[in-house]
């Protein structure tokens, strides 16, 4: 979420704000591991079934019905949305690594433009799947998905606009916001599993994702990371120690929850279907 922002002015020095940078890098390391596992699952589950023309096999994973007999357009839109989730996840990780951005700026620009195009498709296709095709568990669960999609359109547009005008520090901030909401599905899944493991069961959840915990996690999966990101920005700009301590504490707590969620999704949500 924040590792790339260490290069945004004002720069952090080892003596001034070591824990702020270290906590951001710690979160990014855990998140990158979880996102690579997510990409692997998409390729291993959906990619292999699609390559083998086993389209009905998309439904081997319960809850969402991806394949619907006779719905060629809907099926195509669904699998394009799912497979491009792997692309946008890898693209986001690529963009957040400062060494790549600094050493291969052309690659950063090309991947960045591709990220914007894929993000537009993901947002519009997600809205279409939810509200036109009806790929949802309940209207309640569709609302946060739609809010996330609209935020993605806003953030990637702002990031692209600022990049085109050479306002790089502002561009990176909006790009980080776009990274958060572009990974809303991933955040939601690790949030679910962290909640289940911490509470030793699906407290406040139901099969249609309309329980109180479901709704809270649906919105919180992107609003909480965005809030932590904004807190990090404030801590970077401010010389006040209380902002830095708050940001470090939030990031360390976020890292712990992310680690629990990553473990849960790999062990219980993805591995059983591979």
For each feature predicted by the language model, list its residue ranges.
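Alpha-helical membrane insertion/targeting regions
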Residues: 2-274
């Amino acid at each position: 979420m924040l590792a790339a922002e260490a290069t945004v002015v004002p720069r952090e020095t080892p003596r001034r704000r070591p824990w702020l940078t270290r906590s951001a890098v710690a979160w990014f390391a855990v998140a990158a591991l979880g996102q690579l596992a997510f990409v692997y699952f998409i390729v291993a589950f959906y990619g292999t079934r699609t390559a083998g023309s086993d389209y009905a096999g998309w439904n081997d994973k319960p809850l969402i019905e991806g394949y619907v007999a006779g719905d060629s357009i809907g099926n195509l839109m669904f699998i394009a949305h799912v497979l491009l989730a792997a692309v946008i996840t890898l693209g986001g990780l690529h963009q957040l690594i400062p060494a790549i951005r600094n050493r291969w700026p052309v690659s950063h620009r090309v991947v960045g433009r591709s990220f914007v195009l894929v993000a537009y498709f993901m947002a519009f296709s997600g809205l279409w799947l939810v509200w036109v095709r009806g790929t949802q568990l309940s209207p309640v669960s569709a609302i946060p998905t739609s809010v996330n999609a609209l935020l993605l359109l806003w953030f990637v547009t702002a990031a692209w606009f600022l990049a085109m005008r050479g306002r790089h520090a502002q561009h990176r901030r909006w790009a980080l916001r776009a990274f958060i909401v572009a990974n809303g599905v991933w955040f939601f899944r690790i949030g679910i599993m962290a909640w289940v493991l911490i509470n030793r069961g699906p407290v406040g959840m139901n099969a249609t994702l309309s329980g109180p915990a479901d709704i809270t996690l649906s919105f919180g999966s992107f609003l909480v990371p965005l809030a932590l990101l904004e807190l990090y920005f404030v801590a970077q700009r401010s010389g006040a120690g209380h902002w830095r301590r708050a940001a470090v504490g939030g990031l360390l707590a976020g890292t712990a929850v992310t680690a629990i969620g990553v473990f849960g999704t790999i062990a219980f949500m993805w591995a059983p279907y591979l």
